[in-house]
Amino acid sequence: MAFLQQISGLGALERSCPSIMIGSSFRSGNGRVFDGRGIAYLGSREKFGFNRRRRVVLRVVAMSSSSTPFKMNLNEYMVTLEKPLGIRFALSADGKIFVHAIKKGSNAEKARIIMVGDTLKKASDSSGGTLVEIKDFGDTKKMLVEKTGSFSLVLERPFSPFPIQYLLHLSDLDLLYNRGRVSFVTWNKNLLSSNLRASSQGSGNSGYAAFSSKFFTPQGWKLLNRQSNSFQSGTKKNILSPPISPLVSVFSEDVPGDGEWGYGNFPLEEYIKALDRSKGELSYNHALGMRYSKITEQIYVGSCIQTEEDVENLSEAGITAILNFQGGTEAQNWGIDSQSINDACQKSEVLMINYPIKDADSFDLRKKLPLCVGLLLRLLKKNHRVFVTCTTGFDRSSACVIAYLHWMTDTSLHAAYSFVTGLHACKPDRPAIAWATWDLIAMVDDGKHDGTPTHSVTFVWNGHEGEEVLLVGDFTGNWKEPIKATHKGGPRFETEVRLTQGKYYYKYIINGDWRHSATSPTERDDRGNTNNIIVVGDVANVRPTIQQPRKDANIIKVIERVLTESERFRLAKAARCIAFSVCPIRLCPKS
């Protein structure tokens, strides 16, 4: 167990620094290794501090996760408080018990660590020794019965900020969820909360009838929801679930007198106004679980698979193959057990293919996108229903689907982009798709593109103010038609030239002297002259070499335009050449 200690009265929080072991592989559901690395925390050191001026000592401990060795859940923490706690708990329809509000001036507020939305995981028993797992409403009520003494609570902080603004507008009517409206009869006592179970075991079968849904365990919730068909799964296609699950009940300690309850030591109204201003921006909330959308009958796109139950839900939806672009380190960072998910895929007979792409890396996406589309085409040709996923579902997975529609179905990039973004909330890297498109066409054209320009290049010269700067090169009428650079202020001069795919030599003429730039790559020509060189675009390959380009002061931007009929034909040919370079049996590039 790794510890994080905070002593009341000290000015700083002492943090442990765990070691990191790198090297675990990231495997596909059928046992094939594609790429990716994993991390495991090996250990940490604890530090203690004391303040003799204060009687109350607050101890905060970061708890290790479950029984898995050498790992810890940094979202979990333990805090010891005196009674009364001053915490109002809420039970949500998904079976979670979380902090609903904190009383002003209470011990919980003085701790300055507990936040609204933190899930209650464990609590110490009446003797104050053993930590007991909180599974249901009954376990929490047992803890709240005690009037005095100190209690240790283990809480878990959500990955994403809890939507406190929705709690502010809830009324008493919102807490009448299913209260007395649905009866539940069972012979299985394990479906009821702990405070309703008999202490002695009977010889016969006893029946139970419940009219308030707050007395269920998570297992009972799941059974009730399936029978009543009222449960809207977090993976429901094209439907955004509410930010928080409906509340079943709200409860706290029985303390005489009234007190003011709050949601934190910050101006909530200003926070809500800031959230309103940010509406329309995409943000990933891992706590909402896996989200997906149906694009076609055979293609689904969405966020990452988090649990084995997600695999079961996908299998029930008819998914037979998963194309995953999330890396092993990403999965570790989000607390996802990749091995258990791969095992669940094998159990459900769902093919899992892992091909990691770096998140928010336009260059890595551009280089790997052709093979991604090739893998997707191979899966579709084998009559698979494919779920394309990454971490958020906003970028890499949706970019793959858009590129597939653009390259394989002769749909324009604009139409494919609008179609996918209209069905699934996402914002893929559109320039990366356009850049990969020209790389594919260049593959058929032997690295060159004869036709309308494909890229816009801004040539940059850093010299002295007052200089006359001219640009000359392969693209200026065979070095005979110099282009005058524009002074942008200070030592910076710029010239924008629209070029086709290819490799170009160039130089600058500064006040009549021919010179090359020291801030851009250089190369000697056949005559021994040192020239600057720029490579516009690249050639797609089924085995991409992910080598970052050399540092260059010049700026290259891709041009997105409507393809000519000849370009569309060459694009379709190149994309299928990549796809046919993928082995249909092993689903990896042919040797």
Swiss-Prot record:
Residue range of the transit peptide in the UniProt record, numbered on this chain: 1-61
BP GO terms, sorted: starch catabolic process
Residue spans crossing the bilayer: none
Protein localization: Plastid, Chloroplast
Residue ranges of domain Tyrosine-protein phosphatase in the record: 291-453
Knocked-out gene: effects: Slight reduction in rosette size and fresh weight and increased starch content in leaves.
Listed GO MF terms: carbohydrate phosphatase activity; phosphoprotein phosphatase activity
EC number: 3.1.3.-
Top-level taxonomic group: Eukaryota
First-level EC class: hydrolase
Binding-site list for substrate: 390-396
Keyword terms, alphabetized: Carbohydrate metabolism, Chloroplast, Hydrolase, Plastid, Protein phosphatase, Transit peptide
GO annotations of cellular component type: chloroplast; chloroplast starch grain; chloroplast stroma; starch grain
Keyword Transit peptide listed: yes
Active site: residue positions: 390 (phosphocysteine intermediate)
Main location per the UniProt record: plastid
Biological function: Starch granule-associated phosphoglucan phosphatase involved in the control of starch accumulation. Participates in the regulation of the initial steps of starch degradation at the granule surface. May release a different set of phosphate groups from those removed by DSP4.
Full protein name: Phosphoglucan phosphatase LSF1, chloroplastic
Organism (species): Arabidopsis thaliana (Mouse-ear cress)
